[in-house]
Amino acid sequence: MTWTPWYHHRALQRLEAELSLTTGLAIEIEDFEKATPSSYRLHGITIREPETTHEIARIRKIEHVTEGGEVTILLQQPEIQAAELKGIWQLLHQRFLCRPDLTAMPVRVSANDLTLHSRTGAVTLKDVDAWIVPHENAVEATLACLPANSLNDTPINIMVRRDRSGKRPATRWSLDTRGTTLPCSAIADFLPEMEKLGVNAEFAGTMTWQIEKNHWWIDLGGSRFTNVALDRIFERNSHRLSGTATFEFDRCRIDPHSKRSDISGSIIAKNGQMGRSLLIAANQNCGFEVRLQDRLIDQHGDIPFDLLGLGFNVNNAQINLTGICRNEVGYEGFPTDVALCLDGFPIVFSTPQTLDSLSVLNVVAPNYSVAVPMSDQTDWLMNILIPPSRPMPTNQPRIRSANNWHGGPTISQPQ
C-alpha cells in the first residue's frame, strides 16, 4: 500500500474529526507523523471554541505515546488564552473527569515554556508536569509548574479530584504555591474576582474549593494576598478607600450552602485615603472611635492615612474587628485597638464588642439600603457575612467618645 498525499490529507482530516469529537473542541492540525502503531506526532495545532471559533490554545508540536498501559504526552511551546479557560475547563470537566471510561488509563503530560496570555499580559511557566491517575471511585489530575521568573525551585502544585464514592459525585480543587507567589492577574479572566484585586496583586499559600451540584465551598486558610489595590475593591462602592494592602488568612472556610463562615485573619494597608462617609459608617455601625486631628477637621475631601491595621474574626453571623497597628514595626508604642493612624497619631480605634454581620454590611452599604443591606456593593459579601436568623443579643451599652469629630452626629435616633 502506498502512502499518497491524498491519503495523508484524508487521514489528517479523520484525526482532526476524532479529536474534535472526543474533546468537544475544534481541533486544527497542520501536519502529523505516525512513527509506530502506538505513537504519533502532531505539528501546528490550534484549538478553538467550537461555537465562537475563538482561539483557546496554540501548540507547536505534540508527541503522543501509548506504552505499558500508560499514555505519555509532550507539548512543545503551548500558548493558552486565559479568557477561554473558564469555558474550556467546564467542557473538559464534563467530557473527561466525569467520564470514567475516558480516564481509565494513567496519563502523563509534560510541557516546556507554557505561556498564559491574559488582558494584562503574559505569564510563562516552566517545568510543567501533569498526571491523571485513575482510582477505584475517583480520578485525580495533578499539575506541577514554576513561573519562569521564579527564584524558588519548589514547583507550584495544583490538584483536581473527582470523587464518586459519596452519595453525589463532587469535584475538589486544591492549590499550594509552596512559597512561590502567583500574579492574580494571570487568572483574572478565569476567576473574575481576582481582577478586583488590581493588576499588581499576588497570591501565595493554599487554596481548596469543592464544587457539587448546587453547592460549593472554599478554604483559604494559610493564604496571603499582597499588593492588593483597595480602590479597585471599592470602585463600585458608595464609599472611598485606597491604598496598597496585604490580606492574610489564618483560617478561612466559606460554605454558603451550609451558612457557615469561619474566618480569622488581618488586613494591613499603607499610604492610602479613606472617605469621610466610610469613617462615619464605621463609627455609627461598628462603634469605632474617631479622633481626627484639628487640621483635618476643617479640610474637605478624604482622610489620608499612613497605616490601616485591622484583625478580623468571623464566626458565621458574629464578627470581631480589632485594630492591630501596634503590631507593625515602628508602631509598637501605640495603644491597643488602633486601626488607623496618620503622621504618628492614632485617629481610629476599634471596639472590643462582638458585632453582627448586618453591622459590617451596613458599613459598606450605600446610604439608601434597607434593613438587610443587599445591593451591588454588598452582593459579594453576602456569601461571607451570614445574616443572623434572629436578632442577636446586644453587648452592654456603652458610649465611645469621638473627640474633635465634626463629620456629623456620632449617636442618632432611628428615623
Predicted regions and their residues:
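Detector for repetitive beta-architecture
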Residues: 39, 70, 106-108, 246
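Terminal hydrophobic membrane-targeting helix
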Residues: 2-84
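Small-residue helix/turn framework positions
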Residues: 39, 44-46, 76-81, 142-391
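Short solvent-exposed loop/turn micro-motifs enriched in small/polar/acidic residues
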Residues: 25, 55-57, 123-125, 200, ...
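Elongated, acidic membrane-bridging lipid-handling scaffolds
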Residues: 61-64, 92-184, 338-340
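Long, low-complexity, intrinsically disordered segments
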Residues: 398-415
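Extended, regular secondary-structure scaffolds
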Residues: 83-91
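Short acidic, Gly/Pro-enriched loop/turn segments at secondary-structure junctions
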Residues: 71-73, 120-124, 258-260
